[in-house]
């Protein structure tokens, strides 16, 4: 069985402001320290990978905090989903393996994603060609330079300059004490 997690990386708000908003919404979550002007939120309810919950929370947070957010979901280390939110709306979404849940379908290349919007939202327009390449890489091809979807997410996180703990970590990872060793020294703020 592969890795499952979800999280939101927000650009703009302070950790304190996000924590206050989460408390007012009565959410149970962990929040990372700031890194390059971004913070990562690990919401307990979103960990169930219910897209309606993820989309609702993403809209609400970015509208309330007037910011951009990237919600990411890793499903069994086989599929990476993400949504880019800005100011209460979904700008675009992404699915790395759209045929994954169709047993009668051949594998298909990733759908969605918009490297220009993604780089603009996180203030790194010069990395757009690399982000475009990461999003469109077919991991089943012989030319694939990354082996699985966790590594695709980690590559996006690195190139976009997001907190490193945005890839490979979710609410359950933190709560259960299963953090990758490189993140053991991070102090996450608990909410709820």
Where are these regions (language model features)?
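Acidic/proline-rich low-complexity IDRs
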Residues: 17, 21-24, 64, 178, ...
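Alpha-helix initiation/capping motif
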Residues: 2, 14, 43-45, 96-97, ...
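Short, intrinsically disordered low-complexity segments
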Residues: 26-100
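Charged/polar, solvent-exposed surface patches and flexible loops
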Residues: 20-24, 56-59, 63, 120, ...
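Glycine-centered flexibility motif
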Residues: 2, 12, 86-88, 161
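Short, extreme N-terminal segment that most often corresponds to the first beta-strand
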Residues: 1-35
């Amino acid at each position: 069985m592969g890795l499952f997690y979800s999280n939101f990386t927000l650009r703009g708000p302070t950790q304190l402001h996000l924590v206050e908003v989460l408390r007012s919404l009565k959410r149970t979550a962990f929040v990372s320290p700031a890194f390059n002007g971004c913070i990562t939120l690990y919401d307990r309810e979103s960990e169930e990978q219910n897209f309606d919950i993820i989309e609702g929370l993403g809209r609400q947070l970015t509208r309330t905090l007037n910011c951009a957010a990237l919600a990411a979901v890793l499903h069994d280390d086989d599929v990476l989903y993400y949504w880019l939110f800005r100011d209460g709306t979904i700008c675009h979404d992404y699915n790395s393996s759209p045929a994954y849940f169709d047993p009668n379908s051949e594998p298909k290349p990733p759908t969605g994603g918009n490297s220009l919007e993604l780089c603009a939202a996180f203030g790194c327009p010069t990395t757009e060609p690399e982000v475009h390449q990461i999003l469109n890489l077919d991991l089943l091809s012989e030319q694939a330079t990354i082996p699985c979807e966790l590594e695709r997410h980690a590559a996006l996180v690195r190139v976009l300059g997001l907190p490193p703990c945005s890839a490979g970590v979710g609410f359950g990872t933190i709560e259960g004490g299963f953090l990758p060793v490189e993140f053991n020294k991070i102090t996450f703020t608990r909410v709820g």
